[in-house]
Amino acid sequence: MSNISAKLVKELRERTGAGMMECKKALVAAAGDIEKAAEEMRISGQAKADKKASRVAAEGVIEVYAADGRAILLEINSETDFVARDETFKKFAQEAVKAAHAANAKTIEEVLAAKTSNGETVEEVRKSLIAKIGENIQVRRVKTVEAETLGAYIHGSKIGVVAALEGGDEDLAKDVAMHVAAANPMVVSGDQVPADVVAKEKEIFTAQAKESGKPAEIIEKMIVGRIRKFLDEVALLGQDFVKDPAIKVEKLVKDKGAKVVNFIRLDVGEGIEKKEEDFAAEVMSQIKG
């Protein structure tokens, strides 16, 4: 049956999000049965998703959703920044984080099993999107936090932060989250810096101080001072507040009667080794699917 109406093709496109020619081909193969065509395209989409699963997905977005004392952050990856900026991809990420929050998901498996607003699971929508867009799409990381006061900040879809406070208000928590996005502290307070990190820095500072040729007692004071400065630089509370460098973050929250309990910061593609390909190779790869 090759006489497939444009109306039928349009309906299948709206249901699957696939291209016109792909929809027409599926309808021809299904002898005009739209239900059968949609099912076959779903199976085909699964096959495409499996085929693309091994491809490196290092671009993408961070999405955050906070409500009812709980916050969740998701990193959802694509292969290219072009797809990461696509409205369909961004809508999927937004739907996924809302579904995950509603399901109180704490693992990747729980996120993928969460139901979206249209009744499909995140995993089902993900695989459909792979078939439509033609790239490997992965839900890579999920982080959750619970606190009395939560503030979220997203920078350019690439950095997402949630600050968790005791006391204070959402505006204060958002300011702290924005600071964390900009300053990238290692820990909340200096006493949380791992001992091996402090020991390594002390070793470096000691070698530098000895080169000064000063007396041992002076060298010891120099080392103590440099360690203190290092801890202030890597710990959130010791850092100068980005919106007002005249005050420390510790004073900012203390003056509001609050305390920073925790923060979570995610960067897109953090820790992923990107595969280097030239532009021509990338184009050929996409043409071949």
Curated annotation (Swiss-Prot):
Associates with the EF-Tu.GDP complex and induces the exchange of GDP to GTP. It remains bound to the aminoacyl-tRNA.EF-Tu.GTP complex up to the GTP hydrolysis stage on the ribosome. Residues 80-83 are annotated as: Involved in Mg(2+) ion dislocation from EF-Tu. Pfam families: EF_TS. GO terms for molecular function: translation elongation factor activity. This is Elongation factor Ts. The gene is tsf. Belongs to the EF-Ts family. The keyword Iron-sulfur does not apply. Keywords: Cytoplasm, Elongation factor, Protein biosynthesis. InterPro entries: EF-Ts_dimer_sf, Transl_elong_EFTs/EF1B, Transl_elong_EFTs/EF1B_dimer, Transl_elong_Ts_CS, UBA-like_sf. It comes from Francisella tularensis subsp. tularensis (strain SCHU S4 / Schu 4).
